[in-house]
Amino acid sequence: DRDMPEEIEFASCVLTGQGMSIYYEDKLLSDVNYIYADTCFFRTFGIPVLKGNPKDMIMPGSVFVSEHFARETFGDADPIGKILKADRQNDFTIRGVYKDMPENTVLTHDFVVSIHRDGGYQGGYGWKGNDVFYTFLRLRNAADIDKVNDNIQRVIEKYTPAQYDDWKMNFSVIPLVKYHLISSD
């Protein structure tokens, strides 16, 4: 965004969650899908937040839940402040509720966990451990996609440490609609 401020309105890093058993009180919640994301996630995707402040995603252990998940798990009770447990050891505090995503989205999830460490993503953040992240951009003008793609290689060269000069890295921006159609996920 610092390198392409006129083209990019918002950007968000997302990591799909896998492998954690999620509990509310002593009840194992089955078939729960979650993602890790940052504070810009909801603005990047244009997802309305019904309760809470998305800026609270900066706090480690924060989670925002879909309105469907909130209704299924808590009924009519207010979910704000309730605790979800991951693997019976990491506490996630519900800080907000967002409008359900459309069923045809590539990101199917019941809740969004703060990507910030304590209790969140514990993997590598360096050059050799962050290749599992998806980065999503909201462009100010969809026509700028070619301009963004033209600038990506320059940005890679600017920020890649010299020790990786012999690595071949190719990145490009594609419209989310096309990603949905070509993704193998």
Regions found by a protein language model. Give the residues of each.
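Short amphipathic beta-strand/extended segments in non-transmembrane regions
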Residues: 1-50
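Glycine-rich loop motifs involved in handling phospho/adenylate chemistry
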Residues: 54-59
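Sequence-level motif detector for i,i+2 pairs with an aromatic at +2
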Residues: 6-9, 60, 168
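Mid-to-C-terminal secondary-structure elements
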Residues: 35-51, 63-185
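Short secondary-structure transition/capping segments
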Residues: 22-25, 60-66
